[in-house]
Design a protein with these regions (language model features):
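Positively charged, solvent-exposed patches that mediate nucleic-acid binding
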Residues: 1-85
Length: 85
């Protein structure tokens, strides 16, 4: 996964998800997007507010389970300094 962040002027965070056709067919791409969206939803209160985030899924995300996707997302957020422990 790759994460890009940008400050917004709102009190809430926004999440954008991009999964290329190179990752797999539509079933695989939508599964990855659903896992990312759900892991963000469940951890949203721990993120600092006022950020736009775009997560780009790479080939390595194919076949991963929920806990792998969630840990990768939280790791990226911690690297950017937008996640409270």
């Amino acid at each position: 996964l790759v994460m890009y962040i940008h400050r917004n002027s709102m009190e809430k965070n926004r999440l954008g998800i991009s999964v290329s056709k190179k990752v797999g067919n539509s079933v695989v791409r939508h599964r990855i997007a659903r896992l990312l969206r759900e892991s963000f939803r469940l951890n949203d209160e721990k993120f600092h507010s006022g950020w736009d985030m775009v997560v780009v899924a790479r080939m390595g995300a194919k076949g991963k389970n929920y806990s792998d996707i969630e840990s990768a997302l939280l790791h990226l957020a911690k690297l950017h300094g937008i996640y409270e422990k």
